[in-house]
Amino acid sequence: MANQEKIEAVALLKGKLETRNNFILACYSGLTVEEITGLRAQLRKEGSEMKVLKNNLFLRALKESGAHKDKNITFGSEYQGPLAAIFAKDNLPAIAKVCKDFAKNNKNLIVKAGYMDGSVLDANGVDAIAGLPSREQLLAQIAGGINGPARTIASGINQIIASLARAIQATAEKNNA
């Protein structure tokens, strides 16, 4: 790759890292073109993007990007060979779940690491966040948790008012009789 092409590739990766600062690194060696295309389609449905990397250029982009330059991220020997970065904005658990489900049927996709909200994750960490509910599910659970006690209070107030109304009705019927 010519020097200018490398500079452009680093700039492109740097831009992706600054707009989508959460990512998963995965080894895709052995996957067919059809399998990679299928994985990319699933990831696009979740608002994510998969980019095949040159490891040294990605490491350089990490060090230069505003979101990651203060972190000491290095690649060890386990990061040799063909790697792809799967970029996500804020839905990394959903992306991790897509990768985990895909890897069940395609043993050649091996998740190596991830980066989420300032924390470097190993393969086990990425696997753990794959089990987390999505952002929408968490918001629904929070709303349900808030709504439940409010509904109980409203029901209790309605019961008090209803029992008061029944007592007044009974008193009125007793006085009329």
Swiss-Prot record:
The UniProt keyword set, sorted, is: Ribonucleoprotein, Ribosomal protein, RNA-binding, rRNA-binding
- Gene Ontology MF term list: large ribosomal subunit rRNA binding; structural constituent of ribosome
Q: Does the keyword Ribonucleoprotein apply?
A: yes
Could you tell me which InterPro entries the record lists for this protein? Answer: Ribosomal_uL10, Ribosomal_uL10-like_sf, Ribosomal_uL10_bac, Ribosomal_uL10_bac_type
Q: Which residues form a coiled coil?
A: none
Record-linked NCBIfam families:
PRK00099.1-1
Q: How does it assemble?
A: Part of the ribosomal stalk of the 50S ribosomal subunit. The N-terminus interacts with L11 and the large rRNA to form the base of the stalk. The C-terminus forms an elongated spine to which L12 dimers bind in a sequential fashion forming a multimeric L10(L12)X complex.
Which purpose does this protein serve, as stated in its record?
A: Forms part of the ribosomal stalk, playing a central role in the interaction of the ribosome with GTP-bound translation factors.
Q: Which HAMAP family match?
A: Ribosomal_uL10
Q: Which family does it belong to?
A: Belongs to the universal ribosomal protein uL10 family.
- What is the protein name stated in its UniProt record? Large ribosomal subunit protein uL10
Q: Which gene encodes it?
A: rplJ
